[in-house]
């Protein structure tokens, strides 16, 4: 797993700092392996003198290229084996492969052992995994006039890990959140060697829709019957230099059914952020049915034109940093700490809090008799600087989290997930249970932390010291459910204490691991360690935004900012070096 973290994090960091195979002639979705294009010259090919062991390893490398139903890999097979091999569906990424042979003069039978490092779905979704590869069945090689060839192999695709790293690149698709306020990341791995084909591939994937588990958590303004009229070109129609220099990109679509301006703006945002985050630069000329998507942007859109949906913006940035100090909420003002006006600055015994994503409201948990058998907790919600209303209670309540629709999510008594809202009819607080059956069934145990992503479509939880991710789905009846739970960050073990979303694709956690007390994990499940210089353990609460991470340590709150190159370690936050102080940010 250390190798997984070391190699994959290069892709992860590239995606954070920046922010499948071919060019389909139409917008019809094309799964991995079905696109036709020439086989890249750098892929291995079988040669007459190859030993069976070498030929098998080169075959695994060749499976990294999905084009033409894995044509590069099929060159290592006999005709009958190629006809019988089913390469559809997801692929397993494997490493540390060992072959055990039984050999005769004309035939070799092989069993394969390997470590599983992850999987790659047929739409390019990569997820980490761990464990030993179950016996896939025998592999048989026979000697032919051209040398050894594979004559029998199990169905499915096994990707060589190193070759996968060299062939596939991580890009992010963006879909609209249900409220229409922002866009939601959907990372994909694509194998496109020609940079001028990448824009078409990404827009085609947008048209094909989100990954299956996101189908009911996001909106896709590029859904059918909308389709591409042809490949994405330069803004002037040229076929080379797309998105480079001042060439821009031109997307021509047809069968547009969206008429209202806001939906068209969201449609443009999906395209623009998807291309911009792939370093395909504007201006972005977007046409539909032979006319500009919006007349005022006939000459092209820029990221500034869709800045309101920027997936990298910090929620409620104007609200700044707050903290709980001695049980009350304080604000940071020019490195001075002052109690906030109103109820949240007066109420004692506050143990967890969150500022709303607009920066105008607060949700705070008050805990009486903490640690005692008769411990009692209550959730209070109100305007920042105003009065508060009790919205939930229980034996214990975890740190609250705000959604984009201004609902407060909180875990009551270790495993009951609630949404606290203001009833639109009565104006009174309402507590609505969230269906967390899928989470409890797959990951039983107490929930120790729950935080919503900045777009509100995902929930990250700490259960049994592990990071568990689930989708936030609104049912037809208007209720909410946590769906498709899966584990992230196998390399973190069971050491996680608390978590916070740094971006929509990046979670930062505190851990009981004294050597690595703070780590990152992304939506693929890839984890890496943050610097630890200057940190004292144990660490408890953590709060983050795209630029800064704050943690609660034994002596108070510390901060780490990647932008401070001259000070790469953790630094004290002036005024918050008080034992028990905890950082509070919007979210």
Curated annotation (Swiss-Prot):
Q: Which residues form the signal peptide?
A: 1-19
The lipid of kind N-palmitoyl cysteine is covalently joined to 20
**Superkingdom per UniProt:** Bacteria
Compartment annotation: Cell membrane
InterPro entries for the chain: GerMN, Lipoprotein_LpqB, Lipoprotein_LpqB_C
Q: What family does this chain come from, according to its entry? A: Belongs to the LpqB lipoprotein family.
The molecule here is called Lipoprotein LpqB
Taxonomic source organism: Mycobacterium bovis (strain ATCC BAA-935 / AF2122/97)
Tell whether Membrane is among the UniProt keywords: yes
Positions where lipid (S-diacylglycerol cysteine) attaches: 20
Please give, as recorded in its UniProt entry, the membrane topology of this protein: Lipid-anchor
CC annotations in GO: plasma membrane
Name the keywords, alphabetized. Cell membrane, Lipoprotein, Membrane, Palmitate, Signal
What Pfam families is this protein classified in?
Germane, Gmad1
Provide the gene name from the record. Answer: lpqB
For this protein, the record's NCBIfam families field holds: PRK13616.1
Which SMART domains does the UniProt entry name for this protein? Germane
